[in-house]
Amino acid sequence: MIKKILVTGSTRGIGLSVAEKFHSNGWNVCLNGRNQDKLMEISERLNKERSNSALGVKADLSLNSDLNTLSEMIISQWGTLDCIIFNIGSGHGSKGFASTMEENLASLKTNFLDVVKSSNKLCKLLSQNQPSSIIFIGSIAQDSNVNAPFSYAYSKKALNNFARYQAIALSKQKVSVNVINPGHILTEGGVWARKKQESNVEFNNFVSENIPVQRIGTSEEVAEFTYMLVNGNSNKFITGSQINIDGGTSINIK
């Protein structure tokens, strides 16, 4: 039987790489994002590779109406899911104590509360007849000083704690719940691509001083590990865990 996965935030970056990785290994993929044109472009490309293997559902998961639309579309097309990847969040915001209360509340909503709401709704779509998985994409900023906005860091920390409790709550339903915390990842159009373009020298200096493996990570590496975590022989026994994919950055904080 073909397995089915929902990947939120999957029109670019880590989310897209994860969706492509699972699709290339025979999974049917539900793509989600807010850019209808990108969703159509990607789903059409994947369906050319394997017919009827990809859905593209435009939905802003901060909106209850869109969350319901996404849920109803999956139910009508597939019935159930075998895995959900929650790739939701934004690292925008003022650094340190310069952030306003409005920024703090907005970050908490985007990076934590909207994810919790989406997970509580969509976890009901997971198969009841066999083991299934939820993976949250977090950030090493949740417990490492990587100069991220405070609000982003503590929102991701809250997400890690939520995942631990959800892992306990869903354990009897054979649902594993884990968090993957990427470090500095180079993605097309992302912050590190921009910094590299602005000053390749400063970019290389940062990498050599802060990342022990002496290079920045790729979204494909995050996708590779995500797939392994879901499909590995020991995945049924891994739950409530958080795994850093950061080239050693989080243990090299000065």
Where would I find each of the regions flagged by the language model?
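Conserved mid-core segment of classical short-chain dehydrogenase/reductases
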Residues: N68, G89-L105, A148-S151, V191
